[in-house]
C-alpha cells in the first residue's frame, strides 16, 4: 500500500511531478493535443505555480514546479483543466489521465540538477530526438519562458560535446539508433489516438 501523500502547502518547496495518460495512450503525438497541453500548463502558471522545467512525452509529462498554494491543487488544475479543454476543444469523450500523480520534493541544487537533466534527456532516451534542444515539447529547447528556481536550487546543467544535457546517474546513456526529429518521432503505427480530432 502506498503511503499517504504529505500535503504540500505554500512552503516554497519545489517538486518534480510525473503523470501518465489513461492506458498510456499517446495523445501527445498529435500536435493539437500537445499544444493544448502547453497552453493549459502556461495558463495556470501565473496563479498556481512557478514553472522551472517540463517535458511532454507522447503518453506522460514531467514538470519541475513550485506550487503557490498546494501541489495537489496545482496538479488538479493542470490535469483537470486540460481534460476539460480536450473534451470541449478536441471532442474527446473518454478519460485523459490516470488518477493521481507521483512527486519528488527537490532537496538541493544537486537534486535539482539531476531532475533538470532527466527532463532534458527524456526525449533523447526515448529516441524521439537525437539532441534535447531539438525536442519541441520540452523546456530544454530554450524556447519557453520559465521561472527562476528558489534560492539554493539553481542547477548547474553540464552539456556534453553534442550539446545534450548531462544525463542523471540513473539514466541510460545509449545514443544509438535515434530518430532525427519530432515529426518522425510522433508517427506511430500503433496509435490509439489516431482517430482524434
Give the residues covered by each predicted segment.
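Short catalytic/metal-binding and nucleic-acid-binding patches
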Residues: 1-197
